[in-house]
Amino acid sequence: MATNTTEVKAIARFIRISAYKVRRVLDQIRGRSYREALIILEFMPYRATEPILKVLRSAAANAEHNAGLDRTQLVITQAYADQGPPLKRFQPRAQGRAYQIRKPTCHITVAVGAAPEK
C-alpha cells in the first residue's frame, strides 16, 4: 500500500544559539498541528522560539506555494536541531594571555505535511 505523503521543509542555518536550547522547544511542537504550534511558540518564554517561529512560518509558506497544501491542514512531521560550527572568539586575560571562547551555532529544520485523513 503506497501512500502519497507530501512533506515540505524549511531550514535555518548558522543560528547563534545552542542546539540544546533549541531542542527543548522543538520537543514541545513536534507532531502538533501548525496552528497549535504557533500558539505554543507565541507564549513560550524562551529566546529559541523566535528563530523556530520564523522557520515554521517559512515551512508553511513553502507548503502553500510549492506543494499547494492548505495551512490549516498542516502538521509538523519533523522538527530537529543539528549542531553548527562554533564561532571562535578570544577573551583577553592577565599577563598577555587569551582564552578561547566558543559560541555555539545550530541548524534548525522543520518539516510539515498534510494531516492524515480520518
From Swiss-Prot:
Gene3D superfamilies: Ribosomal protein L22/L17. The keyword 4Fe-4S does not apply. One of its GO terms (cellular component) is cytosolic large ribosomal subunit. InterPro entries: Ribosomal_uL22, Ribosomal_uL22_bac/chlpt-type, Ribosomal_uL22_bac/org-type, Ribosomal_uL22_CS, Ribosomal_uL22_sf. The keyword Nucleotide-binding does not apply. It comes from Nostoc punctiforme (strain ATCC 29133 / PCC 73102). Part of the 50S ribosomal subunit. This protein binds specifically to 23S rRNA; its binding is stimulated by other ribosomal proteins, e.g. L4, L17, and L20. It is important during the early stages of 50S assembly. It makes multiple contacts with different domains of the 23S rRNA in the assembled 50S subunit and ribosome. GO terms for biological process: translation. Belongs to the universal ribosomal protein uL22 family. This is Large ribosomal subunit protein uL22. Keywords: Ribonucleoprotein, Ribosomal protein, RNA-binding, rRNA-binding. Pfam families: Ribosomal_L22. One of its GO terms (molecular function) is rRNA binding.
